[in-house]
Amino acid sequence: MNISNIKKIELEITSNCNAACPGCARTQNLDILKVESFTINDLKRMFPVKEHIDGKMFKFCGVLGDPIINEDCLEMIKYLTSNNGYCQFSTNGGLRSREWWIELGKLSKDTGLVDVSFCVDGHKETNHIYRVNTVFDNIARNMEAYAYGGEGRQQATWIYIVFDHNEYELDAARAHAERLGFKFATRTGMRNSMHDWISQTKKKENGKLVKETSVITTTGTKEHSKKALVQDLDAFIKTYKPQMMTTNNIPIVVVDKKAEVLNSIKCKLIHEGEIFIASNQTMWPCCFLWDSQFKNKENIIEKMAEYGGDWNSLKHHTIDEILAHPWFDKILGESWDPIHSKHLSRCIRTCAYNKAYQNEINVE
């Protein structure tokens, strides 16, 4: 595989963020967070020629940060679109000036290559409960500016995670999106169906700032439709032991549920031609394994230690060189087997049963 086979690149251009969403890996791990960003020059080094960009999708998102906090964000979008790269990015929409957003809206209108997902989980009364530290009035101003710049021809979607506390504002948000000329979508995340979150916000009361704590829950029809499948995969991960039989005194592993599970994996890299570039400029098959690296889940750092410190760093290697590395080229797929020395159960949990764990987005 080489860059010509890659169709989609997810870019985490910064690990910085203006928000403090309680379910975010960044908020939960501030003690180990390193605020890192890459520049327009870094992006040009990674994608130096049109052939590496033309016709590909560049998703500005990531695990740890919001792309618009990166000072070079707009220049990156201009560079990629000038080389016929399609830019889709997710943001809480709470930063930048009105003029910045007007320019981005105009770029979307003029090129047809910019699509913004405004991740706004509520309306005036509730968005800040999960999107902690964001200000709805600023977000509304920025969405309005983007629509103004796009003159009705911009591409944008208001994506709304439906929790128990914000469900009642769905109609207000839906109507607001329609006025702006945006699509409207609801999103369900597996982690929200598996966990409750504690939100710490502040509000003014009698002229003083008062702390307010909210428990964020997702119940009933708002839960992910494949929750039971992921629970089944979790049970497999926890209990799997290879069944053995002996033939001529030679132990043989019996084909059991493992085959069903492994054959159902749909890998972002291997099956969909996608790569993920983290804010520290390391390259991964997906955001999930970068998240594992960030937290050192399943001792992933120790499992990769034999490759050296810069084996997947785009500061030291090209995309093609990293794709040719034995781990990307062969070991990744082999390691889905639970008995493999470099096995990461994250691959099963997030991508087995054909990506049961991953977000469900319903565009209306």
Show the residue positions of the predicted features.
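N-terminal pre-triad scaffold of radical SAM enzymes
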Residues: M1-G23, G55-G62, K268, E272-Q281
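Membrane-proximal basic amphipathic "stem/tether" segments
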Residues: M1-N5, S345, R349-E364
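A broad structural signal for short, well-ordered beta-strand segments within beta-sheet-rich domains
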Residues: I3-I6, L113, F182, C267, ...
